[in-house]
Amino acid sequence: MRQMTGTMLLLSSAVVMVAPWAHAEEKTIQLTEAEQQEIKTANEKLLGLTLRFLHDSWPLEIMFPGEVQEEFHSILQCHQMLEQFRQTGNLLLQTPDRTTPLHLCIALGLNRLAVRMVEAGAPVNAQSIFMHDGTKEPGDTPLTWACLSGLYMNSTAEERLPLVHALLKHGADPDQPGPWGVTP
């Protein structure tokens, strides 16, 4: 399995593409050196968790062939997009499943940076794609991720409150349903 893991890493990193929003003018944010370092550190944790997930999930690969590799590939795309965001500050980047830098900064507990991103024009109603039983359904918005508990690294509900306020102030729709029709 370890040999297969290395193969999956090589295959996955070779085919990752990050596409900006179609027909949108570029929106960027000037990241401070401290923010760039914060993103780099969080992104390294994300990659570490990904490799740990892969190592620990070999029984799942046996029971559900291909699903672990698909999940790994998705997380690797997030890692690469976040690195591209760190280098360019482009707020409109997205992975093929429509996860944005704002989604990831929220998920990684980078709340102050996420507030700055919202204020700089990051798409507050961007909705990822949720794969369920082979179908594509509307996924979560940044507001949903900001309201969820247990998704974040080093982030309490109290620390996320200014982010929730910023998202709502800048037009996040609190009634936009995600998977199974759940709203934030």
Question: PLM features: what roles do these ranges have?
Answer:
Residues M1-L9:
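Bacterial N-terminal signal peptides that target proteins for export
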Residues M8-M17:
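Bacterial N-terminal signal peptides
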Residues A22-E26:
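Boundary at the C-terminal end of the N-terminal hydrophobic targeting segment
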Residues L47-H55, E61, P65, T100-H103, ...:
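Ankyrin repeat (ANK) core detector
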Residues I75-F85, L110-E119, Y152-L168:
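Ankyrin repeat structural motif
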Residues G89-L92, V124, P174:
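Ankyrin-repeat inter-repeat connecting loop/turn
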Residues T95, S128-F130, K136, G178:
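Ankyrin repeat boundary/linker residues
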Residues L104-L110, E137-D140, W145-R160:
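Ankyrin repeat A-helix N-terminal signature
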